[in-house]
């Protein structure tokens, strides 16, 4: 069976792929796209869309609007560009050999992105905008669970791996930060602002520095 291309109407559509390499495009409206098996390209286009990659090496492109992207099994790529809103990724894949990635569009470098940890979620915010990506449960089990993403890629060739991301989200800003440790001996420094530091497991050193800070040692 050959690869299929399906395009939606201007309304709220539900499109389903087959066990081949499908291309599904949502067009206007708040659409639901399900690639099923195969190496699929899912494009939400405009609207608040829901994209399910299914099994296979899928590319999920939310487009404009606040979209939900579910990659599932396979080496999946989530693409994001300026002005595309606030997307949420749930990347549940138990394959230990997978390489799942976020790819930012032209003109976006690593210096344009602010990385934060919100509980177990990874939040990537495009500076000077309201655009952001939330990767649900990324830090579950210290970023070793099924929900992790292996790479964050930029068009200039720079790639952030898991270890780099784990380090970056522990760096304080001049504002009010929430910093989290891992199940190792962490050193967290709040810097300026009214900060909250969470050591979690391990023999940690928590330094509030300036501001009215709250420090939680953990186990």
PLM regions: where:
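Short intrinsically disordered, low-complexity coil segments enriched in acidic
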Residues: 1-9, 217-219
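Acidic, glycine-rich calcium-binding repeat modules characteristic of RTX/beta-roll
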Residues: 12-16, 20-118, 130-146, 176, ...
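Disulfide-bonded cysteine-rich modules in secreted/extracellular proteins
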Residues: 6-15, 160-181
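Low-complexity acidic/polar repeat-biased segments
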Residues: 1-5, 123-169
